[in-house]
Amino acid sequence: MAIDDFSRELYADILPDKTQHSAACFLTSTVAQCPYQIDYAYSDNGKEFKGTDSHAFVKACRQHGIGQKFTRINRPQTNGKAERVIRTLMDMWHSKIHFKDCADRHIQLLRFINFYNTVKPHKSLNNATPYEILTAYFNQPICKQL
């Protein structure tokens, strides 16, 4: 999963495994969907995110002009926003819904992401949704310098 630090917009998918290749594919998919520039990928120190220049996720970050930052080792609270979203996913989606099969699980995840981004008020955003925050941001007038 990925979350925008500014708007709390959520991107998530069900990956086949925790490998660098799956993480790189998810990043590429997120970049394709995201309407704004991603400056940094902030992650834990897992082997799926960190490695040499030949590492698939490192290469994907570089190809998309995305820098990498990492949490302090054994300190998941340094990535508190992501940890909170994971808890919300587990509380509001995963533990509440009985999935018929893998396809249904994926459909239900997409529905939850839509709900999370467009309907669910966020206390950290003064009860706005990520969609409302992004809409307000992109609707700002562009000022020209004289």
Regions found by a protein language model. Give the residues of each.
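Residues at alpha-helix caps and immediate loop-helix transition turns in enzyme cores, especially N-
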Residues: 23, 53-54, 81
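Short small-residue beta-strand/loop micro-motif enriched in glycine and branched aliphatics
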Residues: 9-13, 69-71, 95-96
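Acidic/histidine-rich, metal-coordinating catalytic segments
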Residues: 18, 36-52, 74, 126-131
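Short, aromatic/basic amphipathic alpha-helical patches
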Residues: 52-61
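RNase H-like polynucleotidyl transferase catalytic core
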Residues: 42-46, 61-81, 98-102
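Active-site beta-loop-alpha junctions of metal-dependent nucleic acid enzymes
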Residues: 12-36
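C-terminal domain-tail junction helix/linker
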Residues: 64-66, 88-146
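Short, acidic, Ser/Thr-enriched surface-loop or helix-capping motifs
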Residues: 4-5
